[in-house]
């Protein structure tokens, strides 16, 4: 399974990469911004995209969600954000399959990934 992690914070991105890489049959792809993430999405066709919302450079996760879903309406997107839970509902309505509030609990994230792979 291929998972694309999109986060401008290196610590958050690398922590997720290390944890997910420990799982069997998981290939992790990393992007620091949404432009690179969308290019990697189209090139690598990951099974799941895990993205932050607030990123440096002015283009955030909302743009990425819209671009990916325009390209593939069935894309599996998980939003991980420090925003309030009530704010995360917006991203579910946009088409994200799951929204997780930071700090991320690994088991919660893995449960979401597992559910997406079963469906």
Model-derived segments and their meaning:
Residues 7:
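Conserved acidic carboxylate
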Residues 10-29:
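Two-component/phosphorelay signaling modules centered on CheY-like receiver
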Residues 30-48:
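Acidic, metal-coordinating helix/loop segments flanking the phosphotransfer/catalytic sites
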Residues 39, 62-73:
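Short amphipathic alpha-helix used as the core "switch/output" element in two-component signaling
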Residues 52-53:
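Active-site residues of response regulator receiver
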Residues 59, 63, 83-100, 111:
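Alpha4 helix (beta4-alpha4-beta5 surface) of REC/receiver domains from two-component response regulators
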Residues 79-80:
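Hydrophobic/aromatic residues positioned on beta-strands within the core alpha/beta folds
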Residues 104-114:
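C-terminal output helix
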């Amino acid at each position: 399974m291929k998972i694309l992690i999109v986060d401008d914070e290196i610590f958050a991105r690398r922590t997720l990469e290390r944890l997910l890489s420990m799982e069997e049959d998981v290939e992790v792809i990393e992007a620091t911004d949404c432009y690179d993430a969308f290019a990697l999405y189209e090139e690598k066709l990951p099974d799941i995209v895990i993205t932050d919302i607030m990123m440096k450079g002015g283009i955030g996760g909302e743009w990425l969600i819209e671009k990916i879903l325009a390209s593939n309406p069935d894309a599996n997107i998980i939003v991980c954000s420090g925003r309030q839970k009530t704010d995360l509902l917006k991203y579910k309505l946009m088409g994200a399959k799951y929204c997780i509030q930071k700090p991320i609990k690994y088991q919660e994230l893995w449960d979401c990934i597992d559910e997406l792979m079963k469906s």
